[in-house]
Design a protein with these regions (language model features):
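Low-complexity, intrinsically disordered extramembrane tails and loops of integral membrane proteins
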Residues: 1-11, 211-220
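Topogenic membrane-insertion module of multi-pass membrane proteins
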Residues: 2-46, 101
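Alpha-helical bilayer-embedded segments of polytopic membrane proteins, i.e.
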Residues: 10-31, 55, 124-143
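Alpha-helical transmembrane segments of multi-pass membrane proteins
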Residues: 31, 54-58, 168-176
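Helix-boundary and loop/linker segments of multi-pass membrane transporters
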Residues: 38-43, 111-117, 157-158
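Membrane-interface elements of multi-pass transporters and channels
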Residues: 40, 67-75, 79, 83, ...
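Small-residue-rich helix-interface/hinge motifs
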Residues: 48-116
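Hydrophobic transmembrane alpha-helical segments that form the core helix bundle
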Residues: 115-215
Length: 220
């Protein structure tokens, strides 16, 4: 399991995988639409908005990682949003960013510049993704007037949208902090929770090798 954050690329989705994802998504959307329009009430939109908000939260999550890396003086080599075919290239925080066709996950490719507090800084960078989602959750809770109002169900559209955004942010943070190793074609890579544990128990040699590799890559 690598100590760096998602230093891999998923291979582009095959035609069969794309068709499967599209069909499943359409079936799910049709079923959800039928449920929403049957005896419609605004509060029924909550579940749909919860899912829709995962996409902007993916941007926010990866921005949290990249921002913390910049603040702590680490290299931000690349930011990737989604997997599959690259739709466009842009930049964020002076780092190249790729927007891909299926925005269900992302990663930030980083590297330390020095060994100073490397393990602690790495743990903070891992935490920054879920951490910024927790900030979103608590910010909305304060905006709505406290925990009771956050969990009060009503038919106000603005309230429903803010609730759904807060719930999605909290769910994303909690899921990312549960220590898991994600199996990929390039090996096993840690999620944020597992990454925090791994980097805290890594050695200085691990980071020294990482710095050397990053310096070699930067020359090309």
């Amino acid at each position: 399991m690598h100590i760096d954050q998602r230093h891999y690329d998923k291979e582009p989705t095959s035609k069969g995988e794309k068709i499967f994802i599209i069909v499943i998504s359409l079936i799910f959307l049709i079923m959800m639409t039928m449920e929403i329009i049957t005896n419609f009430e605004p509060k029924k939109l909550g579940a749909l908005l919860f899912i829709v908000f995962w996409i902007p939260l993916l941007f926010i999550h990866e921005f949290g990682h990249a921002l913390m890396a910049k603040i702590l003086g680490w290299r931000v080599q690349r930011i990737v949003i989604g997997f599959g075919k690259i739709l466009t290239h842009t930049s964020l925080l002076s780092a190249p960013m790729e927007i891909r066709s299926i925005p269900l996950e992302g990663f930030v490719q980083i590297a330390p510049k020095t060994l100073q507090l490397a393990r602690l800084k790495h743990a903070l960078i891992y935490f920054a993704g879920p951490g910024i989602e927790l900030l979103v959750f608590f910010g909305i809770m304060i905006l709505l007037g406290g925990m009771d109002n956050l969990f009060t169900i009503n038919n106000d559209y603005t309230h429903i949208a803010l609730q759904s955004f807060a719930y999605a942010a909290l769910a994303g943070a909690v899921l990312n902090l549960i220590p898991l190793g994600i199996i990929t074609k390039g090996g096993s890579t840690p999620n944020d929770g597992m990454g925090i544990l791994i980097c805290l128990f890594s050695t200085g040699m691990d980071y020294e090798l990482w710095i050397r590799e990053a310096e070699k890559e930067s020359r090309f």
